[in-house]
Amino acid sequence: MPMRRRQGCISIHNQTRATVVCHQVRIADTFLSRLVGLLGKRTLTPGTGLLIQPSSGVHTWGMAFPIDIVALGRSYEVVGAWQSVGPWCIRGLSFKTRHVLELPTGQIERAQITVGDELCLVAASGACD
């Protein structure tokens, strides 16, 4: 079941590799928040991210910067991962994809994320910037 948290942030951990994927993740779980996503942002700060749910894939049309994209299954298992996806691309489209995590470029490599890894969502204190 998708985690719904309209205020504050979550952090995401890679249980398979015992790494922290992201300390400050905003959840886009309404029609409008999923539609807007990262549009209008100039950058994605290291340690931050956007979890879009539900989602079977994302596009980077109109984006101003490249991002790393992680496609997640129903139980937050990694079903796809793409590094440094530039503007005007589509990624993650799959029947297996239920959620999509957008990260700063290079975060997939830093957090050692690979297909099959199990990610864990953890409540974090404080509000998202």
Regions found by a protein language model. Name each.
Residues M1-D129:
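Compact, glycine-rich, soluble single-domain proteins
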